[in-house]
């Protein structure tokens, strides 16, 4: 039995939160164009159910070979999205956080658990730029100083 929640399950969790806390959200999605990204998107859409079509205002993808995702972030901002569902690997998560901050786009930002590392994503993006992110965690991040003296390590 695995210990990591499935990507679709995580997407369902975010959908439930959005439906409960932001029922009129306009969601912009950035995802990696492969099974990893598509599983997260499927989980979100399944979790939103019949409301997905009206709530999702933009979906843009990126390839792992892309050098930046700046144009995707600008496109999502232009869509009028006030919720950003960010399904990226760490390199692109840091870029997404930073670019949104630099252009003054301040949606409610959901960051998938794959990319919620303090050391490899939040610090490179800038801790000020990372404030307010919503994510999930099922293990302690060894790069987070919060756990530096934790006896579990």
Name each model feature, range by range.
Residues 1-103, 146-148:
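Extracellular/periplasmic Venus flytrap/periplasmic-binding protein
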